[in-house]
């Protein structure tokens, strides 16, 4: 696999996305009060340098300008007259590595606190409320060296949003009352991660290096580091926050990216006006020239006990910081070869031995001054017994690379592939794009910031050899992760409690690895035959349609076709659903369908890896209705890959050894569900309760023992014997070619698997349980791993229809920001607080999801109290405020997809739901604009109020591991906080003891009727 890992700490902030669609975008609005100026000729003392020659993709129609402000801020401006959303991001080149040693997590805490009011806009939720009212959203993350803040907003409101945003860096309040509450949010965020193996392993890696190096710090922080210990030591954390912000939030460490409809000159004026006053404290850029892994930290073996039943091997080498060599990228070159998955690769050989299934190789970010090179594999049961041999194979492959020397043709192939990827780059969503660019501005020259991570320029064999020279046994660190080490460890990591044992790797083992000889099985990759060569953009056909058209409708298949008329890139999305009544008929068949496709993908991996490197990807998964197959990106070689996959599906022969290995890995993944987050458990149980047919993890585990190799071999022809295929072919493809592709898929299945069409009566659709009026049901379970509770409260409203969809979505839009502000920011229920629509099988409702240390019945009472406050808030809402919400939702719904795959996903969602409402957004927004405040109040009073006649409610309570029991409902009269709104008295709910009995006792909703007349849809 490809390179690298990224670790982020971020608060999930609320928000809404997307924007109003017009046949033609209105011209960019001028920003008030800014005279038109041409910056190429003018002089402005606030601007030190202007860079208008930004190298961009030939397909990129946006205009770019780089600035360096006099105060040192680097800026990239993007003018896109077609954008629905404007966006901005600011990246401060300071992160958790700069935390004071005695207050771990301070930079992350500072990131949280900046959202909670500024001198100019003191209201705690001013920023989030402004964004919510204008179809916007925001977030931030803290990493070792960066704190990155970003938002998006309806394009008309960039100036208002940017003004509020700029105050974070000019005059934040960092208010003491907010501080005490927000510590809980950081603590809840950490608590969410405590039992997550990825976080645990990351911190353990940091803890086992040089303890005096900033890399060893605990970046997230928690209540102990941000409140308890500082209080004990007489440290005023608010004073430390103010000091941290005033010290490090210096303009010379900041970079900004702004994207809007405005002209570059107007965007320049706006940024100068809002950010030129940020103070330059001339803070030296933190650098870390010493590596955290010194001689005493090398040749060490760490045996680590995970939470989940996983088996992994991590091999790490310290290497110098390669950032300055980005034009030749030696780490990328070596990662490409060591991480290759084709014939003759390291992975191929380790898989053939039955020791591993997957491999990741490449450079991993450290910080300014140091990096790592990693080779990580998962281990089979057999592989766990052969760790020394696996690492020997790694060194044999590295020795092969040394013997062969750097290959210019390999570098050239990487260079060519990256150049094609850059040339035909998809347009990114504004929010992610600005956030990413703001971070890059610290590392690359302004004119090359868009190309730097794509375009390779210089073949530098000397640098490749330099990095290769670091990949030696004397520099190695090895970590093995396995449940088999339980009870055999002698150390505990401080912050996450990870159990581990550290041993020096014996000298004779190091010597054995040093003597690694050439292994004749290893080969360098051959030339990639999947590299696209035909980039022709096909002209639109005469009968091209604005939405997918049904161009084939037979007993065997339905084919929907849409020629791309928006993006004009040499790409296509081919989506297929193979309906089979055998795929989900019982847990045994569900398991067999899963294993068949996992084994199929496993056997295709060597072949398909070259396609993936060449920008051609595929996906293959089992579904409750059968199998899903997609082939995406460059259309040139898609038919070749699709034919190979289809032939393999129809003629597949199972390898016995791979069957045993993949079955065992599947059993572990089923067992590992117990360690998922409490809120994920709540969502899982609700799906089981509400869907007509859904197999539990326990049922699947029990049935897995019955899956034998002969049984699976017999199942495959049964699965393929009768199918109905529904497909969407969308992109740079003609109608004739689409028909040809569909025919090829059908012919292959008929020829090799003797596939026949399904009978119409075999096309089963699962339905949703219909709750009774005024019914309230509670289902309780315990999470055995996490010490947090989780809850999902679901108010089922009705079947999906234009009117019902808009009632629900508008109500969700109105309550979204207040919900987050009330339940998370003010009441501090937990880090994860979510409200929004839930939709399944054509039925919908309002849901709340919370994860908290507080008990579920308390969370339930707070949600009910919040809903009552929202009724009054809507009643008191001005017409202007109500219309803002309608507009925000309309903008979000009409936001144009930024790339072909996103547009295709919308259409595919309509096909999979069998609703086929391809013009849904326009139809529903037209209805939305007719709604009144009274409509929403009526909707609330009829469906959601405590005494509503058509209230239908299910609550799933997931208890923390240390809670033996908990009442399902309770009153909380002794609340200390007088500001809490009063919770209503709740009736006693019906407790669900048996899911099957619960579902048997209730009717099912009918299926939603398709939006379209199939006879009229045919071309």
Curated annotation (Swiss-Prot):
A motif (SlyX motif) lies at residues 853-858. Coiled coil: none annotated. Substrate binds at residues 359-363. Binds 1 zinc ion per subunit. It comes from the Eukaryota. Detected in brain and liver (at protein level). Detected in liver. GO terms for biological process: amyloid-beta clearance; amyloid-beta metabolic process; antigen processing and presentation of endogenous peptide antigen via MHC class I; bradykinin catabolic process; hormone catabolic process; insulin catabolic process; insulin receptor recycling; peptide catabolic process. Zn(2+) binds at residues 108, 112, 189. It catalyses: Degradation of insulin, glucagon and other polypeptides. No action on proteins. ATP binds at residues 429, 895-901. Its EC number is 3.4.24.56. The modification N6-succinyllysine is found at residues 192, 697. GO terms for cellular component: cytosol; endosome lumen; extracellular exosome; mitochondrion; plasma membrane. Plays a role in the cellular breakdown of insulin, APP peptides, IAPP peptides, natriuretic peptides, glucagon, bradykinin, kallidin, and other peptides, and thereby plays a role in intercellular peptide signaling. Substrate binding induces important conformation changes, making it possible to bind and degrade larger substrates, such as insulin. Contributes to the regulation of peptide hormone signaling cascades and regulation of blood glucose homeostasis via its role in the degradation of insulin, glucagon and IAPP. Belongs to the peptidase M16 family. PANTHER family: INSULIN-DEGRADING ENZYME-RELATED, NARDILYSIN. This is Insulin-degrading enzyme. It comes from Mus musculus (Mouse). The lineage of its organism: Eukaryota, Metazoa, Chordata, Craniata, Vertebrata. The gene is Ide.
């Amino acid at each position: 696999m490809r390179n690298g890992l990224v670790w982020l700490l971020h608060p999930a902030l609320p928000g809404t996305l997307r924007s109003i669609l017009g046949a033609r975008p209105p011209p960019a609005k001028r920003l008030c009060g800014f005279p038109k100026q041409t910056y190429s000729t003018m002089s402005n003392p606030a601007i030190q340098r202007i860079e208008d020659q930004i190298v961009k993709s030939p397909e990129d129609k946006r205009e770019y300008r780089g600035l360096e402000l006099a105060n040192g801020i680097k800026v990239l401006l993007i003018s896109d007259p077609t954008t629905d959303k404007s966006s901005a991001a600011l990246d401060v080149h300071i992160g958790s590595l700069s935390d004071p040693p005695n207050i771990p997590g301070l930079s992350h805490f500072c990131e949280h606190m900046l959202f909670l009011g500024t001198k100019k806009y003191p209201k705690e939720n001013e920023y989030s409320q402004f964004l919510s009212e204008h179809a916007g959203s925001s977030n931030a993350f803290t990493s070792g060296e960066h704190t990155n803040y970003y938002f998006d907003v309806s394009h008309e409101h960039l100036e208002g949003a940017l003004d509020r945003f700029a105050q974070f860096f000019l005059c934040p309040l960092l208010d003491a009352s907010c501080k005490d509450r927000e510590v809980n949010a950081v603590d809840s965020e950490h608590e969410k991660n405590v039992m997550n193996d990825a976080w645990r392993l990351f911190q353990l890696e940091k803890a086992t290096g040089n303890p005096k190096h900033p890399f060893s710090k605990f970046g997230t922080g928690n209540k102990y580091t941000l409140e308890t210990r500082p209080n004990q030591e007489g440290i005023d954390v608010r004073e430390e926050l103010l000091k941290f912000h005033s010290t490090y939030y210096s303009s010379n460490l900041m970079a900004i990216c702004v994207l809007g409809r405005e002209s570059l000159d107007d965007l320049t004026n706006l940024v100068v006006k809002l950010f030129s006053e940020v103070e330059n404290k001339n803070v030296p850029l933190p650098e870390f020239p010493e590596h955290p892994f010194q001689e005493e930290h090398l040749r060490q073996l760490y045996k680590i006990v995970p939470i989940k039943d996983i088996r992994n091997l991590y091999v790490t080498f310290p290497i110098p910081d390669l950032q300055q060599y980005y034009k030749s990228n030696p780490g990328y070159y070596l990662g490409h070869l060591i991480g290759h998955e084709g014939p003759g690769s390291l992975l191929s050989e380790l898989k053939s031995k039955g020791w591993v299934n997957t491999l990741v190789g490449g450079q991993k970010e450290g910080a300014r001054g140091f990096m790592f090179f990693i080779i990580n594999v998962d281990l089979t049961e057999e592989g766990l017994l052969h760790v020394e041999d696996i690492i020997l194979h790694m060194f044999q492959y590295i020795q092969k690379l040394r013997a062969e020397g750097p290959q210019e043709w390999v570098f050239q192939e990487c260079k060519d592939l990256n150049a094609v990827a850059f040339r035909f780059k998809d347009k990114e969503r504004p929010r992610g794009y600005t956030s990413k660019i703001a971070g890059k501005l610290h590392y690359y020259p302004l004119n090359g910031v868009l190309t730097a991570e794509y375009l390779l320029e210089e073949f530098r064999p000397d640098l490749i050899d330099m990095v290769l020279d670091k990949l030696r046994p004397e520099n190695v660190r090895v970590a093995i992760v396995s449940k088999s080490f339980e009870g055999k460890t002698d150390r505990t990591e401080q912050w996450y409690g990870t159990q581990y044992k550290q041993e020096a790797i014996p000298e004779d083992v190091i010597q054995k690895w040093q003597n690694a000889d050439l292994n004749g099985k290893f080969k360098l990759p051959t030339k990639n035959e999947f590299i696209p060569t035909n980039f022709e953009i096909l002209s639109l056909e005469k009968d091209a349609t604005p939405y997918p058209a049904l161009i084939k409708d037979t007993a065997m298949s339905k084919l929907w076709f849409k020629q791309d008329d928006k993006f004009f890139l040499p790409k296509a999305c081919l989506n297929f659903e193979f309906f089979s009544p055998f795929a989900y008929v019982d847990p045994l068949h569900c398991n067999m369908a899963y294993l068949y496709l996992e084994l199929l993908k496993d056997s295709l991996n060597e072949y398909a890896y070259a396609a993936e490197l060449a920008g051609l990807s595929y996906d293959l998964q089992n579904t409750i209705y059968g199998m899903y197959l997609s082939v995406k990106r460059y259309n040139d070689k898609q038919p070749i890959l699709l034919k190979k996959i289809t032939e393999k599906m129809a003629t597949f022969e199972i390898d016995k050894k791979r069957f045993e290995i993949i079955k065992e890995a599947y059993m572990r993944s089923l067992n590992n569900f117990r360690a998922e987050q409490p809120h994920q458990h709540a969502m899982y149980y609700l799906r089981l309760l509400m869907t007509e047919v859904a197999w539990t993890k326990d049922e699947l585990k029990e049935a897995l023992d019955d899956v034998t190799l002969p049984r699976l071999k017999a199942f495959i022809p049964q699965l393929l014997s009768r199918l109905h295929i529904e497909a969407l072919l969308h992109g740079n493809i003609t109608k004739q070619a689409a028909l040809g592709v569909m025919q090829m898929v059908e012919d292959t299945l008929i020829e090799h698997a003797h596939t026949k069409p399904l009978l119409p009566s075999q096309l089963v659709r699962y339905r949703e349980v219909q709750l009774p009026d005024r019914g309230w049901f509670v289902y309780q379970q315990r999470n055995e791993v996490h010490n947090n509770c989780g809850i999902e409260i679901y108010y089922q409203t009705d079947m999906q229809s234009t009117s019902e969809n808009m009632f629900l979505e508008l109500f969700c839009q109105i309550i979204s920001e207040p919900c987050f502000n009330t339940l998370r920011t003010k009441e501090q229920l937990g880090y994860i607080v979510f409200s929004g629509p839930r939709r399944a099988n054509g039925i919908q409702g309002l849901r709340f999801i919370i994860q908290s240390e507080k008990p579920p019945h308390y969370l339930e009472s707070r949600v009910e109290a919040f809903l009552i406050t929202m009724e009054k808030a809507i009643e008191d809402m001005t017409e202007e405020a109500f219309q803002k919400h309608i507009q925000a939702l309309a903008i979000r719904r009409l936001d144009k997809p930024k790339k072909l795959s996103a547009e295709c996903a919308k259409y595919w969602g309509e096909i999979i739901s069998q609703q086929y409402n391809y013009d849904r957004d326009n139809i529903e927004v037209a209805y939305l604009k007719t709604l009144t405040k009274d409509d929403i109040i009526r909707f609330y009073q009829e469906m959601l109020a405590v005494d509503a006649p058509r209230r239908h409610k299910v609550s799933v309570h997931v208890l923390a591991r240390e809670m033996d029991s908990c009442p399902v409902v309770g009153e909380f009269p002794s609340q200390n906080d007088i500001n809490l709104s009063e919770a209503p008295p709740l009736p006693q709910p019906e407790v669900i003891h048996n899911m099957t009995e619960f579902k048997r006792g209730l009717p099912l909703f009918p299926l939603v009727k398709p939006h379209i007349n199939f006879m009229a849809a045919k071309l």
